[in-house]
Amino acid sequence: DKFDVLLANPPFGKDIKVKGEEKLKQFDLAYNWKKEINTFSKTNKLKKEETIQILFIERSLKLLKDGGRLGIVLPETFFHAPKSRYVLHYMLRNNNVTWMLDLPHNTFRPHNNAKCVVIILEKNRPQQDFINMAVAEEIGHDHQGKEIYRWDYIKKETNKTELWDDIPLILEEVES
């Protein structure tokens, strides 16, 4: 069965490896990839191990119907680390990225220190001419997990009834 919508948050805070030929050969991303001009191609050489987060991306895409939507949380470093380029290529080829949401560093703190981005894409659809982008400056809590509230500029005090969380505003935009 395939899904219309899939939301994913791969376990990227830990270095969990998948090993074993039987498991790995199920995944294109468990093979070595060769860089070519403006692209990457899969080789026939299977790796000895791969991180679960990379395989999570591929499995998420395979579980979607054509035209299905994937919302996936990824570490920001994934987008600029040279060793992840082939994975980024795999994820973006033949798919339409509709949104990129930059999350605040405190999003998963105090339990995880990773700075994250959410990608929303449509499977097997041509890339539209633009990608919607949003930056959430606050997520409703600080680095220790304590709630933070919006500042009331008129009263010059903290509004104790409204969490400072930009995500609901961004979700309104995504849904429209």
Set out the residue ranges of the language-model regions.
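S-adenosyl-L-methionine
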Residues: 1
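A conserved structural/catalytic subdomain of Rossmann-like adenosyl-cofactor enzymes
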Residues: 4-176
